[in-house]
Design a protein with these regions (language model features):
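N-terminal hydrophobic/helix-forming segments and targeting peptides
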Residues: 1-177
């Protein structure tokens, strides 16, 4: 029909709060591997601890080819998380203000703990993670420099309330505007 008869306009934005990977995100600490992040958007950092996270984005390889990443949304996928202390070990942490319970620099994403089987190398867990990523996606650690990866809550949208009159989902308030 012609525009003169009217139109419906729908608009959305997708700048939902998230954890973006830094350019050199992969590191090992205490025999566990992590991605170092920085947060985007107005987040309550304490809400990001121990929830399942999915990874989304794209990695540009050195040869210019790209790899789309979507890990954690399918039921068979692994998920990731920001670690937090158990309550009985967190006495000092619990003295912090709400905005500092989890500090920005503590929002590192746990990505693995299994070491590479070679006694002659250091950072065995980091090496094992890179071996997995290279085998599955054909990427090297240098490829992270040109990657745009983000971690988001790995929860499905659900009805809220006995009457199912509301929805609860990551970013729905941003994506519907």
């Amino acid at each position: 029909e012609p525009v003169e008869k009217g139109v419906h306009i729908a608009a959305a934005h997708i700048d939902s709060p998230r954890l973006d990977m830094k350019q050199h995100p992969l590191f090992e600490n205490e025999e566990t591997a992590y991605f170092k992040t920085h947060y985007y958007g107005g987040i309550k950092k304490y809400q990001w601890g121990t929830i399942p996270l999915a990874l989304h984005g794209v990695i540009i390889r050195a040869d210019g080819s790209s790899v789309k990443v979507n890990i954690g949304e399918d039921e068979s996928d692994p998920v990731f998380c920001v670690t937090d202390l158990l309550p009985h070990l967190a006495q000092d942490q619990m003295k912090r203000s709400a905005g500092e319970i989890l500090k920005g620099e503590e929002l590192n994403i746990l990505i693995g703990s299994r070491p590479f089987r070679d006694d002659d190398v250091s950072e065995k867990v980091k090496l094992n993670i890179m071996a997995i990523l290279n085998e599955k996606y054909g990427i090297t650690e240098d490829d992270f420099v040109s990657a745009e990866l983000e971690a988001v809550p790995a929860f499905k949208a659900k009805d809220i309330g006995f009457d199912r009159s509301m929805i609860g989902a990551y970013g729905h308030d941003d994506k519907v505007c």
